[in-house]
């Protein structure tokens, strides 16, 4: 069992002395009460003297524990949690005891450090670091006290991710796009840096995890002729042929995120072959011989969860009796556990909001996870063995922000043009935020992806707009996750078709319900949401008074030519081959219809964006100059696909607010 080192970097909870920041984690006042949702209403309500003006820096600049790039990791002895936090203004690796009495900062630099993973002996931490938001993550290791930092990979043109320690702690498995094409599976020796390539970089491999004896890796990959399907594969860690587990038995769908049971006899995974994402088990008994070689048999598949709600992210209890997993119910996500023998299923953590990255301690009862609500950013929480309720380890929200002055979004559904119900979150501003306008203006906040989902978690953009007196509709249009496979695939081959209809139907619903005034609605979104913002302004110009797009796609043809290889495959999977579907690529691009954009448009872009290059935005800027459309354009240096620096996030939202104030409130 690992012991705390004699020396540590500075104790972050003690040393953090910036003015008016949140109290240390051990003194958080009644967090369970503060995050309870308020009464649902589709009209502005008053909170009286509790309302106060919030500075944009306190809201948009609020730190949060990273939930995009690897999340958290619980140490093998269950005593400490490693995580990436931007409390200093940049994502750095931190460690905190599960008792919550200390927080230690381990890295300190200008580059983003994410994806921390403990070595099996608890003495080392591996993590990823990129430069300027370029997502070309390199693998680093350091001692558990933050010392002896060492870079293991140096292929600066490639990105590395999904790192996993071997059981003996001598190697790390990962995927990289070192060939410049798709992501393939590799192993690096921690001591020497020697690399072993396990796959051919033709299939976009992901999520490698070691068998308990270190002889095999399980990973997910798309190796069907139809790249819309995914399955689990085994490959010898010494190199060799990959074996498909055939968890789908020839049906359409995806099986991903495989996790070995502690005894190595089963693999828990997420699959949507029955329409909803659920947790299943692949029983490997009889599949491998005594020497560990394949016998040519398929595993026995058992469905472990059986729910109308999507279930994902399985994690084994160390005693092997069951798994914890995440279950999404509309806009909320809870942690649950299910036992292998009985299939008995019960909640573990069900705070209002969204839970992610659940990890089980060696006692099989302690559970660490990330949690965020509409009124609090992503923080590390722990439910200790025999504890009734979980407790926070970190506290990210500034003490200057009263959670009660933030809006609790309402989960609504509205009909689209074809009759399909579209789920959405509605942020209704408090009466005190209005400007004597009667019916307030509205902003439709379109998420990226489109594989993604608006959840009842920390959304400082929607909160800020609501605080400024805007109604915000955050729709989960067709193509979103969280509502089953059919809904998720409903816009495949039709981006800018019926999904655009879902966006426009949301505006009609706001107007018909008297929630927002006509011709006082703006569109806002990033990435795919940025594409949809620009495309909506071009194809439905009568609906919109203004738009703001950040890191948005303007031409699917040129994006296919300039983006990363794995994203090119994603485009082909969702839109078709760029030659065979050339007309679709052309017609569904905002650039094609740029002359039809009449509403004022603000375009924001990261200079280092590896997904949607700056050249995308500049094509539309040139077209708008020719058509004399009112627009503005700003590029952020040292930023990628989204804005990681606090000053840039603040500037982005300040520009967007001024844009909407000027054009929706004129």
Regions found by a protein language model. Give the residues of each.
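Multi-bladed beta-propeller domains
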Residues: 3-23, 27-28, 35-68, 95-112, ...
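Short, solvent-exposed loop/turn segments at conserved positions within beta-propeller repeat blades
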Residues: 86-91, 132-137, 177-183, 224-230, ...
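Residue-level detector of Asp-centered blade-edge/turn motifs that repeat once per structural unit
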Residues: 76-77, 120-121, 167-168, 212-213, ...
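Active-site-proximal cap/loop segments of hydrolase catalytic domains
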Residues: 475-666
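Beta-strand-rich domains and repeat architectures in extracellular enzymes and scaffolds
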Residues: 57-92
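Hydrophobic beta-strand positions that form the internal "hydrophobic ladder"
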Residues: 81, 122-126, 169-172, 214-218, ...
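Cap/lid segment of the alpha/beta-hydrolase catalytic domain
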Residues: 396-519, 526-527, 554, 559-569
């Amino acid at each position: 069992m690992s012991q705390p080192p004699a020396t540590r970097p500075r104790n972050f909870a003690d040393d953090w002395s910036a003015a008016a920041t949140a109290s240390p984690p051990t003194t958080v006042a009644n967090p369970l009460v503060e995050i309870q949702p308020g009464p649902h209403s589709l009209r502005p309500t008053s909170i009286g003297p509790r309302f106060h003006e919030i500075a944009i820096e306190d809201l948009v600049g609020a730190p949060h524990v990273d939930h995009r790039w690897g999340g958290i990791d619980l140490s093998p002895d269950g005593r400490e949690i490693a995580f990436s936090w931007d409390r200093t203004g940049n994502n750095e690796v931190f460690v905190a005891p599960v008792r919550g009495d200390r927080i230690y900062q381990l890295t300190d630099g200008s580059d983003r450090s994410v994806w921390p993973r403990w070595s099996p002996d608890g003495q080392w931490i591996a993590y990823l670091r990129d430069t300027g938001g370029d997502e070309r993550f390199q693998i680093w290791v350091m001692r558990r006290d933050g010392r002896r930092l060492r870079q293991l990979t140096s292929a600066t043109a490639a990105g590395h991710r999904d790192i996993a320690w071997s059981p003996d702690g001598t190697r790390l498995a990962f995927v990289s796009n070192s060939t410049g094409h798709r992501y393939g599976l590799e192993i690096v020796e921690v001591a020497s840096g020697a690399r072993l390539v396990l796959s051919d970089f033709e299939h976009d491999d992901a999520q490698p995890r070691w068998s308990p004896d270190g002889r095999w890796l399980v990973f997910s990959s798309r190796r069907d002729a139809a790249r819309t399907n995914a399955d689990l594969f085994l490959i010898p860690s010494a190199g060799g042929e990959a074996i498909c587990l055939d968890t789908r038995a020839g049906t359409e769908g995806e099986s991903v995120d495989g996790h070995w049971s502690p005894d190595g006899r089963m693999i828990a995974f997420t699959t949507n072959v029955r329409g909803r994402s659920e947790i299943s088990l692949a029983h490997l008994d009889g599949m491998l011989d005594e020497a560990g070689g394949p016998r040519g048999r398929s595993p026995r598949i058992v469905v472990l969860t059986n729910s109308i709600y999507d279930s994902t992210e399985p994690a084994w209890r160390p005693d092997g009796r069951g798994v914890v997993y995440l279950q999404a119910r509309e806009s909320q996500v809870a942690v649950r556990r299910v036992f292998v023998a009985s299939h008995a299923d019960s909640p573990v953590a069900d705070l209002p909001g969204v839970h992610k990255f659940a990890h089980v301690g060696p006692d099989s009862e302690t559970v660490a996870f990330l949690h965020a609500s509409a009124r609090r950013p992503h923080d590390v929480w722990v439910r200790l063995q025999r504890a009734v309720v979980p407790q926070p380890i970190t506290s990210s929200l500034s003490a200057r922000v009263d959670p009660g002055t933030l809006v609790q979004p309402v989960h609504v559904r509205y009909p689209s043009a074809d009759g399909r119900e579209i789920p959405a979150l509605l942020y209704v501003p408090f009466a005190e935020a209005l400007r004597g306008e009667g019916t307030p203006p509205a902003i439709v906040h379109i998420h990226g992806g489109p594989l993604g989902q608006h959840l009842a978690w920390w959304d400082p953009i929607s909160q800020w707009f609501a605080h400024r007196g805007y109604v915000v509709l955050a729709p989960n249009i067709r193509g979103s996750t969280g509502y089953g496979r059919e809904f998720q695939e409903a816009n495949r081959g039709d981006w800018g078709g019926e999904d655009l209809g879902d966006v426009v139907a949301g505006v009609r619903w706001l107007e018909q319900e008297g929630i927002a005034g006509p011709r006082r609605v703006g569109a806002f979104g990033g990435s795919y949401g940025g594409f949809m913002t620009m495309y909506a302004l071009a194809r439905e110009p009568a609906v919109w008074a203004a738009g703001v797009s950040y890191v948005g796609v303007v031409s699917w043809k040129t994006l296919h030519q300039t983006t990363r290889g794995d994203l090119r495959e994603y485009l082909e999977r969702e839109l078709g081959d760029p030659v065979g579907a050339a007309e679709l690529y052309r017609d569904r691009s905002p650039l094609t219809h740029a002359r039809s954009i009449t509403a004022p448009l603000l375009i924001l872009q990261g200079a280092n964006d590896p997904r949607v290059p700056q050249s995308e935005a500049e094509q539309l800027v040139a077209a708008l100059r020719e058509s004399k459309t009112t627009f503005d354009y700003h590029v952020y240096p040292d930023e990628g696909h989204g804005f990681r620096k606090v000053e840039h996030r603040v500037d982005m939202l300040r520009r967007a607010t001024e844009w909407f104030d000027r054009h929706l409130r004129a």
